[in-house]
Amino acid sequence: MRRLRWLNEHVPDEPFPAADQALADPNGLLAVGGDLSPERLMSAYRNGIFPWYGEGQPILWWSPDPRGVFLPGDFRISRSLRRRLNQTRMQVTLDTEFEAVVAGCAAPRPDQDGTWITREMIAAYTELHLQGCAHSAEVWLDGELVGGVYGVALNGAFFGESMFSRMEDASKVGLTWLTAQLWRWGFALFDCQMSNPHLARLGVREIPRSEYLRRLEPALRAPHRPPPWTLEAELDPVSEHRHREGP
């Protein structure tokens, strides 16, 4: 029987167990405890691990099998989303309101009981943003923030953490623009952690953890994209995703 490793909160450079040591039930639970220091968080992402826990719980570290990912060419733009992209007055920016996007993701939702984005998590990812490691895409309508996405970047891999919408399709619009720009910059992997029906409709594929780790390794050798991030003026997300599609 595999036993969970308890991490020492005072040793941020403590190595994680190998991802393949994660439990099968609950799927992917690997370690408990530690802290959310930038050093430990970035070590986790480099090893295919991420934190996910609720209020009142210790920090829980996960590496599920299978893993939900977007790869270049995977993103599916439906007819309705294409119409939204072509007709909407929504505007998309990068890295202009990171804290507001995280707050939007942490806000209560009708279909959820509580939030996993605790105050501790908000502080930790805000610090990563200040260090140039965490990034956001903001979706605006008439000057109001109506949606967004945030996550962590490591060389050629982006690890999506959460997204939110205050109007129909706002998060899809933000995700469409963000992934298009990432592919343009040469990113090789967008990690969604775990798939769900919403993401599956957009093209997320589930791959075995072993394959995920194989794909992560070369992505981590790609060049670093320095902050601040901005969308390229000539970027057309529909054309960019179509260009990446296979025959």
From Swiss-Prot:
The residues the entry assigns to the signal sequence are none
Q: Where is this region: Disordered?
A: 227-247
* Any single biological process term in GO: protein catabolic process
- Highest taxon in the source lineage: Bacteria
Alphabetized UniProt keyword annotations: Acyltransferase, Cytoplasm, Transferase
Tell me its EC number(s), please: 2.3.2.6
Biased amino acid composition, Basic and acidic residues: 238-247
Specify the species: Halorhodospira halophila (strain DSM 244 / SL1)
Q: What is this protein called?
A: Leucyl/phenylalanyl-tRNA--protein transferase
The first-level EC class reads transferase
Q: Which PANTHER family match?
A: LEUCYL/PHENYLALANYL-TRNA--PROTEIN TRANSFERASE, LEUCYL_PHENYLALANYL-TRNA--PROTEIN TRANSFERASE
